Amino acid sequence: RRQRQMCIRDSIKDSFMSVVDYAESKVTAVHYSLLNAGLFINVKDNVFIEEPLQYIVISDKEQCLFNHVTIQVGKNSKFNFIENYVNNQKEDKAPFSLVSEVVAHEGAQINYSSITNQPGEKRGTILRRGLTYRDSLINWNVAAMDEADVYHDNTTNILGDGSEANLKIVTLGVKEQKTYFNSEVVNQGLS
């Protein structure tokens, strides 16, 4: 049992903050220092999970949310993930910061879907970062249904030959909402 705990701890240690560094910016430094929720998923090599894992975060009182999702998908594995952020407090003015790190190892495929719904008084950032190794794929599907002012940064680093990333974004603007999107796919060369 102790050996298993050490294995899990080492896996988290190797994955957490491997794509988004705390020293990257003031936004990430604040995110890591105020982190109050999150999820870690490690899919082993050669595992196919057809049924999507759905992660729902519901805010039913005024609060700051600094949530972090870390997903590692092993070699030749396939995984589907859906995250849903819902805030039922229309007068909630507390800031939020959501960070997702996704790593697709050789031959892995990840379908990552995200639905956010934050009320109009909130302000926040959503950073989604991915790494793809040889012959791997990350499909990002983002539905930004927020009334809040949100900065979205979606960056995927293509590290391996034959790997790819796709991004689809749907958003609805309402009232005086300001939504900013920065999307990058960075090809780092053959490996």
Predicted regions located by residue number:
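Short, small-residue-biased leader/transition segments that mark boundaries at the very start
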Residues: 3-8
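Conserved beta-strand/loop scaffold segments within soluble protein domains that form the structured core
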Residues: 11-191
